[in-house]
């Protein structure tokens, strides 16, 4: 077995343990607003989710969206999907489903947060097509990004389009 992989995930008992006795007491004292939890994977394809899809599944995303309420959308890291592609994805998912698109690697890895206004504008225009199904976008920096470059992150966040 490779770490983190199993031959047949259908044989795993994913039953959650009982709540700790103090959980109800602590939650009863909470005065916070309601919140939603979104759970999903980084991809929905059959190769990465071996054994997840029932035999004969014709459309992975449609089935995936019956089991999870979100997806960490890695596809946007490599290229920007067309408005038509985003519409197709949206139509295959239920109303409360969210897409959490990763910011393109052109911003994070190639330009390393320098002179990215044009790419960020294109990215923002693209992901706005998710409409109500757009979750939070996120940035994954290169593994050799250093603390000395934090000023780039500050500028990037400051300049980020407010509509996203």
Question: Can you annotate each of these PLM segments?
Answer:
Residues 1-164:
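Residues lining hydrophobic/aromatic ligand-binding pockets adjacent to catalytic sites
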């Amino acid at each position: 077995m490779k770490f983190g992989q199993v031959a047949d995930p259908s044989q795993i008992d994913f039953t959650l343990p009982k709540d700790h006795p103090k959980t109800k007491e602590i939650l009863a004292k909470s005065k916070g607003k309601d919140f939603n939890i979104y759970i999903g994977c980084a991809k929905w394809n059959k190769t990465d989710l071996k054994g997840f899809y029932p035999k004969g599944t014709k459309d992975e995303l449609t089935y995936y969206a019956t089991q999870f309420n979100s997806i960490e959308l890695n596809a946007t890291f490599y290229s920007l999907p067309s408005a038509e592609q985003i519409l197709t994805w949206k139509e295959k998912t239920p109303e409360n489903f969210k897409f959490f698109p990763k910011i393109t690697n052109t911003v994070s890895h190639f330009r390393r947060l320098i002179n990215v206004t044009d790419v960020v504008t294109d990215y923002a225009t693209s992901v706005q097509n998710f409409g109500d199904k757009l979750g939070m976008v996120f940035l994954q920096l290169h593994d050799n990004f250093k603390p000395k470059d934090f000023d780039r992150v500050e500028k990037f966040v400051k300049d980020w389009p407010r509509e996203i």
